[in-house]
Design a protein with these regions (language model features):
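A short, flexible beta-alpha/helix-coil linker loop
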Residues: 29, 117-119
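Glycine/threonine-rich flexible loop motifs
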Residues: 121-123
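Conserved N-terminal beta1-alpha1 strand-loop-helix module at the mouth
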Residues: 1-110, 126-132, 136, 142-145, ...
Length: 189
């Protein structure tokens, strides 16, 4: 759970794996399931070789076809029951204590909380919750929380100090080794 790197291609996944990613999440928004499966095959193989967990974003069917370790779903996405029944690790996004509690009740294996800070990667993510919002979510649920949104090597340690069990990065995936070093340096793990 320490370092989730969210990627769109195998080249970025490779850099993330070499940098110490513990989870590599393939996120291809608006892409049909068959295309996700095709793009995901080399990423899944890379994850198996590097011992990183492989998670597919928003597509339970693709996750199952790729024999992924898990799937990450948004609050309103369907497929949570299928993911749980299939034994997949289930990540669910949350932007508030209420949403985090609901995610835990829906069987989340982990909660992606954020955005912690504003991020250009996902302009529709809503208002930043900050470290105080992250800490409140971490205190409200027993499920591990992964901080996302504007996280990089300069602030990953702050997320861990606020109670997160890990951080998720998109833009910083190419700097995974620096983010991993910052996360590992946190004494609150």
């Amino acid at each position: 759970m320490r370092l989730h790197c969210i990627v769109e291609d195998v080249d970025t996944a490779r850099v993330a794996a070499e940098g110490g990613a513990t989870v590599i999440q393939l996120r291809l928004k608006g892409v049909p399931t068959l295309a996700v499966v095709e793009a995901g095959r080399p990423v899944a193989a890379l994850c198996r070789k590097s011992n990183a967990a492989f998670v597919v974003n928003d597509d339970v069917e693709a996750a199952l076809a790729l024999n992924a370790d898990g799937v990450h779903l948004g609050r309103g996405d369907e497929g949570k029951e299928l993911a749980r029944a299939a034994g997949l690790m289930l990540g669910i996004s949350a932007t508030s204590i209420y949403e985090a509690i609901a995610a835990a009740e829906q069987g989340a294996t982990y909660i992606g909380a954020g955005p912690i800070w504003e991020t250009p990667t996902k302009p529709d993510a809503g208002s930043a919750i900050g470290l105080d919002g992250l800490a409140a979510i971490c205190e409200a649920v027993k499920v591990p929380v992964v901080a996302i949104g504007g996280v990089d090597a300069s602030n990953a340690r702050d997320c861990i100090a606020a109670g997160a069990k890990g951080v998720a990065v998109v833009r910083a995936s190419k700097d995974a080794s620096e983010v991993r070093a910052a996360v590992d340096a946190a004494k609150t793990f």
